Amino acid sequence: IIFARHLRELGRPPGWISVPLIVTSHAWEDGKNELSHQDPTVGEALLGEMSDVSRVLFPADANTAVEALRSVYSGHGQIGCLVVPKRPVANVFGNAATRALISQGAALVAGDLARCTVQLVAIGAYQLREALRARDRLEDRGHSACVSYVCEPGRFREARDEMEAQFVVSEDALCGLFPPGTPRIFVTHTRPEPLVGVLRRLDTSLTACRFAGFRNRGGTLDVSGMLFANRCAWAHLIQHCAELLGIQPATLLERSELEAISGHGNPQVVF
């Protein structure tokens, strides 16, 4: 990818078809091998490269996985890392929505951006599941919320040179997907720290944004157990929402759920 970029700089773009790197049996699934196999570093490392040649995509379901693969193969001189669950997940995106997601890098999944009090932003298939569950609880308790999905975080970064600037989305497109001033909860497949840097354009402030992700907590756990251990379960997201909205968590969570996320109850009540 370094040589391919040099060729572009010289006006001789490479002709080789872009290469997909499929990352599956990943951090949130591979419980049998404990932390030795529970590591999202591959995607994080490639996000550190220039995004116009090093693409990192997080398909949300089978439809988006197919479209993401098609997008990679239609390009030239790039590596495309696809972080894909190996286990069945529900299809969230239809055909038209799938094409829009891959084209734009992100899309609204549920809710109304114009009237929501908080925006839940998921990066990763299992993270989207938890964000949707959190939204359901917020709506049930009278708080308008929306869920957005970021499939390709590199599209939303601050461009580091002119070539990358041609790849990232414009400010107008970004504001259309992520309205300024809206409190946001991010929940990501990766460790949160790399995404805080990549998504700096979406991070409004410490008081208006929270990031959840892989905290290096692992073990012989299933997906739900991994999400809980890393404080990425839907109830943890609700707790973040309560902090941003300035309301008591007890108005959004049952007592048993509060006890679970505080470490004093049965975690399975939020599985």
Give the role of each language-model region.
Residues I1-R5:
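Long, structured ligand/cofactor-binding scaffold of large enzymes
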Residues G11-V19, T24-E44, G48-S51, R55, ...:
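Thiamine diphosphate
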Residues L57-N63:
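Acidic carboxylate-rich catalytic motifs and surrounding loops in phosphoryl-/glycosyl-chemistry enzymes
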Residues R70:
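Hydrophobic alpha-helical positions that pack around
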